[in-house]
Amino acid sequence: MSKNKFVSSIALVGVSALLLAATATGPASAASSASGVTVDAKAAAALPKQFKNKPLNVGSEIPYAPMEFYDKNRKPVGFEVDLLNAIAAKLGTKVEFHEQAFDTIIASLQSGKHDLAVSSMSDTVERQRVLDFVDYFQGGASLIVQAGNPKKVTGLGGLCGATVTTEAASWEVDVLKGASKTCTDAGKAAITTLALPSDVDAQNAVRAGKAVAYLSDSQAAAYTAKVAGKGKYFQLVVDPAAPNGYESGLIGVGVLKANSGLTKAIQLAVASLISDGTYTKLLKQWNLESFAVAKATVNGTKS
């Protein structure tokens, strides 16, 4: 869920309303994590009138731990949940998370259903045709395999001829295409990509032996390896050729280009969180310090 998520073709308004309805649930009030965060006057003043006095609606694929998942009371929790609560506090408002299939999140903004896309969504040049991104995270992709690593996987370069799973419509699909081309260019068998609807589906494919490995966002892969089955289900593969993950990129809050005032307000809020130390505190809380950005940029990805 950066899942560094990347949509191969931008979803347009014409996506069926029936599809949106079938892949979304009602709003969920996020467990509050903004205690002690004070309103930033400049950021709050920049928030456009139409977004004041009501919660900001966030489209997000849940679960995608540690970024967003449900606690025992089915309240959304996770780093991105905490961050959005803190952003909202800086703006003097609230947020509501709405569970949405990843490949319909952009369409949900275009239809007016949601205001923000927050789901470990990669800031890509292609997406920038439709959305502006306030970047708050930088991460790559990593592999997890069955615990014990029975196939002795050392990295993408050793997976020629194997089946690797990932989430459909994710950035990792293109990473696997590139790795597969490297295989075939070298006269080896291609990598078979098993693209599945959700993070849970991809995990289950590896556990069931339908895929040798799962390529996911580095932070999610590390968390899954540590937590799933109390650490007994999966193992993180650290590739010596890419110790920090494959093709690191920026992740951000997605906002429709038409809502440039909202983008500016969120950028000011994130900058304030970085300045007052809240941002670093939240990263440390989720053991994600290595994925920090130095400043709140808009559309930081240039190619």
What are these regions (language model features)?
Residues 94-158:
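Acidic, polar ligand-binding/catalytic clefts
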Residues 65, 76-89, 142-198, 203, ...:
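Bilobed "Venus flytrap"/periplasmic-binding protein-like clamshell domains
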